[in-house]
């Protein structure tokens, strides 16, 4: 492999993701606009289509202001880490072919997504601001809590499919989508992904009325744009993963890419719809939901999915 190939391959993967993420921000602003009986962005370019590009250019040409009391290295390192991790997570996704087909894809995704906690905590601490630190601590507690349920839901799904690779999910769902037999898991998964990506109604980390802007309050210009890119890249990733886990592939192999993309965009628009419809949770309600409702239910379902095949083993097939 030549040096050019080594550079072009990742770029061919990264640029479409970043473009999709940029236009997701436009879709969000348009959708929220129409839900609030207004137009949304419509000045920059035809129908406001160039708005994300204008926003990106505007942010990156602004001066990156650093607080005088902040930790300079960590302050600039954490946004870079956030975006890097968000893009690394796309590598093993079968769309329908992965850039790198790993044997333990799901374990890799769980491991890398849990590392994003460090970028949030680091940014809150390095800012040397009480609002940023409180926002970061909230974000970390929320992310770690909901990762527990995401992990348990995935364990249940692995029992259905019989493998840790995402390609086995495609094979297992040829007959029926997993959203039908495992709809309680799908509902909990969707709500947990909302919380994991810090989206409304779980956007307690950036509660403007309490914390100004959360852990990224001291960031401006380029570093702020990197956090913004990471957040929306993670939203798209979670919806792409939800599509692979619960909504299966297309039966028509010619349109498998288009089919996957349409399902992902429908789920992403549901994320935006939820933001327009629901008020923010109180912090204790957020924690009660995961530790007192989701955790017992997911553990019960895991027990059920383990015990059912064992108890039915040896019984004649007609039963």
UniProtKB/Swiss-Prot annotation:
Q: Which GO terms describe its biological process?
A: aerobic respiration
Question: Which membrane topology term applies here?
Answer: Multi-pass membrane protein
The cellular location(s) given in this protein's UniProt record come to: Mitochondrion inner membrane
- Which coarse location class describes where this protein primarily resides? mitochondrion
Top-level taxonomic group: Eukaryota
Question: What PANTHER family does the entry give?
Answer: NADH DEHYDROGENASE SUBUNIT 1 (PTHR11432), NADH-UBIQUINONE OXIDOREDUCTASE CHAIN 1 (PTHR11432:SF3)
- Matching HAMAP family: NDH1_NuoH
Q: What is this protein called?
A: NADH-ubiquinone oxidoreductase chain 1
């Amino acid at each position: 492999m030549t040096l050019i190939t080594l550079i072009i391959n990742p770029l061919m993967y990264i640029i479409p993701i970043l473009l999709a993420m940029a236009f997701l921000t436009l879709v969000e602003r348009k959708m929220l606009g129409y839900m609030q009986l207004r137009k949304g962005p419509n000045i920059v370019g035809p129908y406001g289509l160039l708005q994300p590009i204008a926003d990106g250019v505007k942010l990156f040409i602004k001066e990156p202001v650093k607080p005088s009391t902040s930790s300079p290295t960590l302050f600039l390192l954490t946004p870079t880490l956030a975006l890097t991790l968000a893009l690394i997570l796309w590598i093993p996704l079968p769309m329908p072919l992965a850039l790198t087909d790993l044997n333990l894809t799901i374990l890799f995704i769980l491991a890398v997504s849990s590392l994003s906690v460090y970028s949030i905590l680091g940014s809150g601490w390095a800012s040397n601001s009480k609002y940023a630190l409180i926002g970061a601590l909230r974000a970390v507690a929320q992310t770690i809590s909901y990762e527990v349920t995401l992990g348990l839901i995935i364990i249940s799904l692995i029992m259905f499919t019989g493998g840790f690779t995402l390609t086995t999910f495609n094979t297992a769902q040829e007959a029926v989508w997993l959203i039908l037999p495992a709809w309680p898991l799908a509902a909990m998964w969707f709500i947990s992904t909302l919380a994991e990506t810090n989206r409304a109604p779980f956007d307690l980390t950036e509660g403007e009325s309490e914390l100004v802007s959360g852990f990224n309050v001291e960031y401006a210009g380029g570093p702020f744009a990197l956090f913004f890119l990471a957040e929306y890249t993670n939203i798209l990733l979670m919806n792409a993963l939800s599509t692979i886990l619960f909504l299966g592939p297309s039966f028509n192999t010619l349109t498998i890419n288009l089919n996957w993309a349409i399902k992902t965009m429908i789920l992403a628009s549901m994320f935006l719809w939820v933001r327009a419809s629901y008020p923010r949770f109180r912090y204790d309600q957020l924690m009660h939901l995961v530790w007192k409702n989701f955790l017992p239910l997911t553990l019960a379902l895991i027990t059920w999915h383990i015990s059912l095949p064992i108890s039915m083993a040896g019984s004649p097939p007609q039963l």
